[in-house]
Structure formats: C-alpha cells, structure tokens
C-alpha cells in the first residue's frame, strides 16, 4: 500500500530535526583528570541497510516510477528483479523475488549512508522508495565515532575471543585495526580517517588528526546498537608502573606482539587483560559510551524515521 504523499509529510516536518540527522551532537562528558584534553567524539550512523518485501502490485508500480524518474539509474531489469542507484549514486536499491523466495528472505534491499543525504533527499527516499515496502526493517547499522585525536598509540583490545587484525602505515605505526570478521554480526574497525580521505582524494581534513572507531552491526545485532561495544577497550597502558618484574616483562611482550596472546593459557590471558586495563589512565570507550548515552534519543529518532510511518517529533 502506497503511503501518504510528500505534501502531507512536509506539513508535519520541523526542519531542524532532519537537518540534525547527520549532525549528532557532542556530549558534555569527560573521562577524568588524565583525559581532559581529549575532545568528545562526533557520533553518527554512517551506513544503513533496510530490507523489506514488495508485493506484485507495488513491484510493478515502483518499477514503472523508477523507469521514468530522472534521479534514478536503473539496470538489470526483468519482471522479477531490478537494480538501481538513486540520488547521484548515493543510494543502492536491489529487488530480486526469485532469489528471495529460494533463500527465504525479504526481496528488496536499500543501502545508503544517511550522512550523505540532505533533508529533502531523506524525505524523497522515504516517500518514493521505502514506502512501497512491507515488513521492512534494518539488517545493517554502522555506528561511527570520530576522534580528533591520534589513536595510533592507543592499545585496543576486546574482553571477548575475537579475531584481531592490524595493518601498519608507512611510518610503522598502526593505521587500521579490525576486530572480528567482515561477515560476522559485529565487525569493529579503528582506522586513520584522515589518511583514508587523503588516499581516496576526498575532501581534505583540516584538523591535525581524525581517527574513526566504526562498529558495523548486522542481522540480529542491529537491535543492540545502543549497547554493542561493552567488551571493547581503547587504552594507553603504562607498563612501567607494574611492580612485579615478571608481569612487567610479559605485559610489555603482549603489547609489542599480538601473536604472544595465543601462547597464553585462557586464565593467564584474562589476568593480563585485566592488568593492562588497570595500568591505563584512560579508556576511550568510556567516552564513547557517555557520548552514545547523551545522543541515544536523537539516534533512536533517526531509526524511527526510517522504520515507521511519517510521524515527526516536536
């Protein structure tokens, strides 16, 4: 069933709400006396995937609309499937009924970065594309925390047994850290965003540093976006403060070579992870949690906007 028209939606819209979708604020929190110089990260949803079902009538109606809409580039068109990009290639759309039926999944998928869409583009996408879908919901949400801080010297670890991969830059310092695997329900990336933009010839970053902690959530994990990194720690451990010589040597070894963790017994791994947390005056994930808490309601409004009928808040 096609939902209400654009004019009716716009009557209820307060402009600042959608304008702020990609500009989630900074929290006023700080960690402690050791970290007052660290600015709060900027927080946003950086990627979204929405899936749903098109019934036969809506599939025909949407296909007809897309074939004449100048903001859409359509290809791979058959009676039961199509692919498209919309809004200057910022939105990817795919419909495949045969594949969906054979794999027992929903037949339409829409992928986009909400940070790259204007308020009017969000309304256009919601009204003209998403409104055709039934039983729609998120299958991917990416939370992005942007720090104007050099995170290359921080030590990141997880309380869980997840795969950790590190890539080093030309200067020998860590430039990208991965936790988990790409196809898992949660995949964490910590990387030098300023360097990435430079490599991709994107807009220059004016700040001295820009690092991103990005948490990619898929499938069932999207429901836990507001509590999805409690096991993660981004630390500055001071191994020299450890009194016991043997422990000090082992911690130094573990901080210097990730492969050494695999040689420890499980109980020893737990012991030294706790010790590393104790000797760090800062854990940036505390700042991430307080920032997320301060912005949770605004982020939930974004989710509600995409998932529900057009009901705008005051």
Swiss-Prot record:
It holds the Pfam family Rep_trans. The keyword Nucleotidyltransferase does not apply. Keywords: DNA replication, Plasmid. GO terms for biological process: DNA replication. It comes from the Bacteria. Disulfide bonds: none annotated. The nicking site of REP proteins is sequence, but not plasmid, specific. This protein is probably a specific topoisomerase involved in initiating replication. This protein is specifically required and may be rate-limiting for replication of the plasmid in vivo. Belongs to the plasmid replication initiation factor family. This is Replication initiation protein.
